[in-house]
């Protein structure tokens, strides 16, 4: 365990905004987590578990303790049909996917290059190119912050949805994910429905082929957060009614959409791009010129710049299409999680 007093959070969030915290503690084990949550010194302080900070925007000084998750380790067991991989929650997700591909554990390759750590994956139910975590997740192990006991949820108990899970609702602020177990079928079935992957639909395609192709696609479309500060997709793809979709198609016949149970899922990046916002900039914050769904820190952005830009994008899309975008990125103001409308009101009133 390592304790840092009133230090900058810049190295610990992929937006690279220069906010700070009262206290930063690095937790290297489950016992460290138990010690932190049971220590009377921290009882009245807000405590935020943080993995890679790849889906987080600190909007001002964090009044409390930021606990860096540095729980590492991997183990593999198997049945006749599946590999079961138990992954500690601090493991880097992109490195994990590459390790799986290199070691013959197929079925995870579509989730290549998604920034973050393994413990964050079930919170958001991360997904890309036709695959979601829920499709390969066997169970999630977590530390109950009330009892300080380790508990486990089966896949069905995690209540996975589109960028949703029980960890964002019923168990929010009540647990820390300590490990996940993945179930990967030994009989690999590639997921190639996504357009650019269609040229891999032949009998000779391997998991490495799919992994390499997805890395190529993502490298072209998405900026590397190690080079350009960003949190990946800033907004969720909205779901609208069939009637709303048909009405929009009269004006925008090329509007891309996908059938879902609730109606039509619309590509948020297309909405932003079609609104002419690619490259739009507010001080150091900018809509990425290649992928409109990504907001970037060009090097000098403050959290306020990013909030102003996000609010402008949200309002522009609402005015143009009558669609309200919901952000994927989680915002923290005064040590508490908040939302874009609240944060904008806080900054401008």
Curated annotation (Swiss-Prot):
Report the top EC class in one word.
oxidoreductase
NCBIfam families with a match to the protein in the record: murB, PRK00046.1
Q: Where, subcellularly, is it found?
A: Cytoplasm
Q: What is its EC number?
A: 1.3.1.98
Q: What is the name attached to this protein's record? A: UDP-N-acetylenolpyruvoylglucosamine reductase
- Which SUPFAM superfamilies does the annotation name? FAD-binding/transporter-associated domain-like (SSF56176), Uridine diphospho-N-Acetylenolpyruvylglucosamine reductase, MurB, C-terminal domain (SSF56194)
**Catalytic reaction(s) noted:** UDP-N-acetyl-alpha-D-muramate + NADP(+) = UDP-N-acetyl-3-O-(1-carboxyvinyl)-alpha-D-glucosamine + NADPH + H(+)
Set out the biological process GO terms recorded for this chain's protein. Answer: cell division; cell wall organization; peptidoglycan biosynthetic process; regulation of cell shape
Q: Which cofactor does it need?
A: FAD
Q: Pfam families annotated for this entry?
A: FAD_binding_4, MurB_C
- Spell out the PANTHER family in the cross-references: UDP-N-ACETYLENOLPYRUVOYLGLUCOSAMINE REDUCTASE
Similarity-based family: Belongs to the MurB family.
Q: Write out the pathway annotation from the protein's UniProt entry.
A: Cell wall biogenesis; peptidoglycan biosynthesis
Quick one: which gene encodes this?
murB
Occurrences of domain FAD-binding PCMH-type (ranges): 17-187
List the HAMAP family hit by this protein, alphabetically. Answer: MurB (MF_00037)
Described function: Cell wall formation.
Entry's Gene Ontology molecular function annotations: FAD binding; UDP-N-acetylmuramate dehydrogenase activity
Q: Please name the catalytic residues of this protein.
A: 163, 233, 328
Give the UniProt entry's GO cellular component terms.
Answer: cytosol
């Amino acid at each position: 365990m390592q304790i840092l007093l009133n230090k900058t959070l810049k190295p610990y969030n992929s937006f690279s905004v220069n906010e700070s915290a009262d206290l930063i503690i690095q937790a290297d084990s489950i016992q460290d987590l138990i010690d932190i949550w049971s220590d009377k010194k921290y009882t009245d302080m807000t405590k935020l578990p943080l993995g890679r900070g790849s889906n987080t925007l600190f909007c001002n000084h964090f009044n409390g303790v930021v606990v860096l998750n540095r729980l590492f380790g991997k183990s593999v067991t198997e049945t006749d049909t599946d590999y079961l991989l138990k992954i500690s929650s601090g493991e880097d997700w992109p490195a994990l996917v590459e390790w799986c591909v290199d070691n013959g554990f197929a079925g995870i390759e579509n989730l290549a290059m998604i920034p973050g750590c393994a413990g964050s994956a079930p919170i958001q139910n991360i997904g890309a190119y036709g695959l979601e975590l829920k499709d390969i997740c066997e169970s999630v192990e977590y530390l109950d912050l009330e009892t300080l006991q380790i508990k486990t949820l089966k896949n069905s108990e995690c209540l996975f949805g589109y960028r949703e899970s029980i960890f964002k609702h019923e168990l929010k602020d009540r647990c820390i994910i300590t490990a996940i177990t993945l179930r990967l079928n030994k009989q690999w079935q590639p997921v190639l429905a996504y357009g650019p992957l269609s040229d891999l639909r032949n009998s000779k395609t391997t998991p490495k082929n799919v992994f390499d192709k997805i890395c190529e696609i993502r490298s072209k479309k998405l900026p590397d957060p190690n080079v350009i500060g960003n949190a990946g997709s800033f907004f969720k793809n909205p779901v609208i009614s069939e009637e709303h979709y048909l009405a929009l198609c009269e004006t925008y016949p090329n509007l891309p959409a996908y059938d879902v149970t609730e109606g039509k899922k619309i590509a948020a990046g297309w909405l932003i791009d079609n609104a002419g916002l690619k490259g739009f900039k507010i001080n150091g914050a900018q809509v990425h010129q290649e992928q409109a769904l990504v907001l970037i820190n060009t090097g000098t952005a403050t959290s306020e710049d990013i909030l102003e830009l996000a609010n402008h994008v949200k309002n522009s899309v609402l005015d143009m299409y009558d669609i309200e975008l919901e952000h994927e990125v989680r915002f923290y103001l005064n040590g508490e999680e908040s939302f874009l409308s609240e944060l904008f009101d806080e900054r401008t009133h």
